[in-house]
């Protein structure tokens, strides 16, 4: 009997009969984290299609808390397998070309707590462990800096299965993700949309399937205020997985506070809806980000430019207007002529 079937049999049997399990089975590992983190010039939870300029770099350190991200149910019986979970993330990105940005993410599960799973024949979970590292490449397609109406980028990422299986921080195999992100101004606000697909190993808690892979469609939207002071953010995220009976939806609201032109703090929190594993009923995200970009390069004209020579301006001389010549008249010619008759 393969592990997923044995797991479901153990859970259902324990909930119905409530025996004391003597042989404990380790829960097959899968990645419980569902939050997509974005890098560079965008929000930490949603991409906006912008890229770092060549030579620019961005580093972020974030910590988050999740409440009830994994709950097993069987009728009225319930097992809070992961009631509380805290994790940290170190992420960085670098602008290579005007159309290419590379990034890396290193997550870590700091601690997690839940009900004792030995009642259903499961071994306890590890409280700490390394998460799934992610390597990412972002390709710029459109840019408002180039005079185009929107910012548009394509993200390609791969998650490496090197994390801790007992901490529910890795899949059985690598995960691949493709995502398109777009951003544009919307009056006094900055809006962004994203849509992507994730190919990952099938969740062992899902019903059995002939395929060991599962496809997941992820959508997101964000509205943010602009300015140099405190900026507000409102994000909506949704996921529709082939191995889940209902979608996963999260709403996050918060803000970003610049400390100086390169350093800023961010904080977001909000509820989650859905019974998909990894969807908490509440999530809190705090962190700090650092971004430094060189000034944009001067662009030089490639076409030949005719040479010019500076010369003193020659102003036309005004012609002198000479008064008409006055011819003297003898005085006697001015006197009245004598009348010869007198």
Model-identified regions with their sequence ranges:
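Transmembrane beta-barrel domains of Gram-negative outer membranes and organellar outer membranes
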Residues: 23-307
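Cleavable N-terminal export/targeting peptides
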Residues: 1-28, 295-342
């Amino acid at each position: 009997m393969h592990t997923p079937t044995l797991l479901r049999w153990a859970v259902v049997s324990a909930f119905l009969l409530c025996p004391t399990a003597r042989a404990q089975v380790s829960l097959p590992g899968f990645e419980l984290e569902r939050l997509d983190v974005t890098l560079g010039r965008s929000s930490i939870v949603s991409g906006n299609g912008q890229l770092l300029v060549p030579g620019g770099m961005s580093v972020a350190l974030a910590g988050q808390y999740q409440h009830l991200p994994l709950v097993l149910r069987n009728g009225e019986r319930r097992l809070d397998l992961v009631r509380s979970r805290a994790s940290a993330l170190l992420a960085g990105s670098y602008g290579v070309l005007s159309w290419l940005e590379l990034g890396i993410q290193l997550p870590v599960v700091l601690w997690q707590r839940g009900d004792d799973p030995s009642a259903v024949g499961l071994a306890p979970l590890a409280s700490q462990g390394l998460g799934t590292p992610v390597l990412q490449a972002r390709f710029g397609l459109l840019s408002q800096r180039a005079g185009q109406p929107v910012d548009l980028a394509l993200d390609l990422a791969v998650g490496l299965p090197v994390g801790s299986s007992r901490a529910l921080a890795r899949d059985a195999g690598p995960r691949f993700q493709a995502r398109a992100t777009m951003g544009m101004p919307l009056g006094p606000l900055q809006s962004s949309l994203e849509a992507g697909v994730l190919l990952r190993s099938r969740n062992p808690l899902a019903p059995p399937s002939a395929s060991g892979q599962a496809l997941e469609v992820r959508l997101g939207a964000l509205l943010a205020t602009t300015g140099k002071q405190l900026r507000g953010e409102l994000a909506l995220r949704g996921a529709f997985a082939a191995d889940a009976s209902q979608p996963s939806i999260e709403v996050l609201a918060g803000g970003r506070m610049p400390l100086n032109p390169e350093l800023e703090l961010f904080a977001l929190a909000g509820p989650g809806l859905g019974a998909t594993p990894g969807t908490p009923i509440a999530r809190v995200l705090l962190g700090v980000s650092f971004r430094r970009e060189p000034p944009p390069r001067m662009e030089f004209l490639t076409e030949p430019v005719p040479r010019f020579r500076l010369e003193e301006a020659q102003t036309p001389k005004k012609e002198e207007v000479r008064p008409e010549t006055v011819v003297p008249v003898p005085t006697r010619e001015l006197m009245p002529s004598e009348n010869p008759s007198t």
